[in-house]
């Protein structure tokens, strides 16, 4: 048909930490495993990721858990991909959230921009090691890691690439 895809799915990872019926493990252990599983399936390393679409539900426990996982994967290795979340613009789509975020990230890859995190006035000091961007940048990502976490410690990660 001659249609160019918006993005290519390189890999995915899933892991559950079962810490609590409602929340993920406070240290982000399940999300770390899901990210590592996605890297393995995609055949890439953390150094190849230039943008992370965080799950970022704006909850103290959830954001802290995800922040620790991202710190383990990236900051501890002196890597600083751009990180933002589209939820502040779209709201939480509940069971649609990960699909909606995949569409938005695919559009960002195709159109050549990196979405910023809306409505951040003061970044929590515990996230200062992370490269959280607040405004949209007109530089498109090449390799994107997109996180989704759910009740009971369910974690799914997709890795998308510019085709």
Report residues per predicted region:
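Conserved beta-strand-centric core segments of catalytic alpha/beta enzyme folds
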Residues: 1, 97-163
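Condensing-enzyme catalytic core mediating Claisen C-C bond formation in acyl metabolism
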Residues: 1-42, 50-51
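Beta-strand segments within the central parallel beta-sheet cores of soluble alpha/beta enzyme folds
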Residues: 4-12, 47-54, 81-88, 116-123
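Conserved small-residue
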Residues: 9, 49, 54-55, 66, ...
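A glycine- and small-aliphatic-rich helix-loop capping segment at beta-alpha/alpha-beta transitions
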Residues: 26-30, 65-77, 161-163
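Stable alpha-helical structural segments in soluble proteins, enriched in small hydrophobic residues
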Residues: 34-42, 69, 73, 105
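Glycine-rich phosphate/pyrophosphate-binding beta-alpha loops
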Residues: 57-59, 88-95, 148-155
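Conserved catalytic cysteine-centered active-site region
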Residues: 67-99
């Amino acid at each position: 048909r001659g249609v160019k895809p918006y993005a290519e799915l390189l890999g995915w990872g899933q892991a559950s930490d079962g810490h609590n019926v409602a929340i993920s493990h406070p240290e982000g252990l399940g999300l770390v495993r899901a990210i590592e599983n996605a890297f393995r399936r995609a055949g890439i390393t953390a150094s190849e990721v230039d943008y992370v679409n965080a799950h970022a539900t704006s909850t103290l426990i959830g954001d802290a858990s995800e922040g620790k996982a991202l710190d383990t994967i990236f900051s501890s290795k002196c890597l600083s991909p751009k990180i933002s979340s589209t939820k502040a613009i779209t709201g939480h789509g509940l069971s649609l959230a990960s699909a909606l975020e995949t569409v938005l990230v695919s559009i960002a890859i195709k159109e050549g921009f990196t979405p910023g995190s809306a409505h951040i006035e003061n970044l929590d000091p515990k996230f200062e090691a992370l490269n959280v961007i607040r405004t949209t940048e007109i530089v498109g990502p090449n390799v994107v890691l997109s996180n989704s976490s759910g009740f009971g410690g369910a974690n799914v990660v997709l890795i998308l690439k510019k085709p």
